[in-house]
């Protein structure tokens, strides 16, 4: 479990690690990061914005902290040839992963975005992090890497993979999946 303040203190480092380790697997297509930044929303809320493109598809996503569930939250918008896919059905057609995804108003930006539902995230991440090896990063970065692997972009688009080796060198097979 992490707090909003811990999220705020670590989001920039996490985004840097995530972008350095984001891969597109099982395809010859390349992807590009068009834009990324971390923004302070108000006195105590921060979020990151990342935009990636694969051929004509653009995925804009934010990572923020949801106070109600006490977990990070992924919101995204999809574009085809720079045309915003406004219909929820068109959005759902392209989001083919295993997480529950709904169209909601972004809790900070107050515009319609697809949202990976945060239900059960807290328990899932806590159980994944039980008995983990010593991490070469702080525990918040470890938590965010685990969360992103399970509930972030790869959960919706399994072609994306992020597998940073966050553990101390001599530990075998400890990459976040």
Swiss-Prot record:
- Name the job this protein performs: E2-like enzyme required for the cytoplasm to vacuole transport (Cvt), autophagy and nucleophagy. Acts as an E2-like enzyme that catalyzes the conjugation of ATG12 to ATG5. ATG12 conjugation to ATG5 is required for proper localization of ATG8 to the preautophagosomal structure (PAS). Likely serves as an ATG5-recognition molecule.
- State what protein this is by name: Ubiquitin-like-conjugating enzyme ATG10
| Recorded GO MF terms | ubiquitin-like protein transferase activity
What gene name does this entry carry?
ATG10
Subunit organization: Forms homooligomers.
Q: Give a GO cellular-component term.
A: phagophore assembly site membrane
Q: What is the lineage of its organism?
A: Eukaryota, Fungi, Dikarya, Ascomycota, Saccharomycotina
The membrane topology of this protein is: Peripheral membrane protein
Q: Does the keyword Membrane apply?
A: yes
**Of which family is this protein a member?**
Belongs to the ATG10 family.
Q: Which UniProt keywords apply?
A: Autophagy, Membrane, Protein transport, Transferase, Transport, Ubl conjugation pathway
UniProt record, GO biological process: autophagosome assembly; glycophagy; nucleophagy; protein transport
Which species is this UniProt entry from? Candida albicans (strain SC5314 / ATCC MYA-2876)
User: Coiled-coil annotation: which residues?
Assistant: none
| Entries under Pfam families matching the protein | Autophagy_act_C
Alphabetized InterPro entries for the sequence: Atg3/Atg10
Q: Give the UniProt subcellular location, in the record's own words.
A: Preautophagosomal structure membrane
Q: Note whether Nucleus occurs among the keywords.
A: no
Q: What induces it?
A: Expression is decreased upon fluphenazine treatment.
Q: Under which EC number(s) is this enzyme classified?
A: 2.3.2.-
Q: Which residues form the active site?
A: 135
